[in-house]
Amino acid sequence: MNVAIFGSTGFVGKYILNSLIKNNHKVYTLVRKESEHKIKHINPINIINGEITNSTSLEQTMMNCSTVIYNIGIIREFKSKGISYKKLHLDYAKHVIDKAKLLNIKHFILMSANGVKDFGTGYQTTKYHAEEHLKKSGLNYTIFRPSLIFGKPKNDQEFCTQLRDTMIKLPIPAPIFFQNLNIFKAGNFKMSPIHVENVADFFVKSIENKTHYSQIYELGGLESFDWKAIIKTISIAVRKNKLTVPAPV
């Protein structure tokens, strides 16, 4: 199959690229010129240089494809640099979805996230509205909502690496979160981390498989951990005795 992917230069995107190639798909990806070096070593792929806001660039990326994967996302905003949840999760996604509809793309696969909802955090809400736009587009779609994704970083910032660098290694207590004034339940919420290779394989196995059309899949690993256990596990791995403090969400 000919597959277009948007969001191929990050942690998860590179794994999806490799899985696509391993399964003999012909891959097209839109990449800004300054980011091309991140995936130039992955072959064979067809790289289109351009901006996602440019209609011609989108058409060049998708015109020969039957499936589109939208994997653009961030877990932290930098609004001073124009990097926001709304722009990357929603505005850009809508732009690609609408173009895919015009090009009669057979199957659209969207990377969403576990716990998305309307009127949630900025991250949750923008992911939710991207899902809703896709569901109303008339395209055959598959939506994946993974839990925390971990794996070998390969010079990228995956979850455990970011947690280590931005929380565990800092000389201040790590926050353990709670909601609705339930301070005694701080850090007790459960998560089921999933390996990045499993996520990539789920994406690729769903391609143009009609049993996966109009489906939303929540992805998680075999085991569940609470936030306190995750903090403790990573702290032990980096040999650091980490204090924690309750923090409201």
Residues of each region from the PLM?
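Structural motif
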Residues: 2, 66-67, 107
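N-terminal Rossmann NAD(P)H-binding glycine-rich loop of SDR-like oxidoreductase domains
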Residues: 3-23
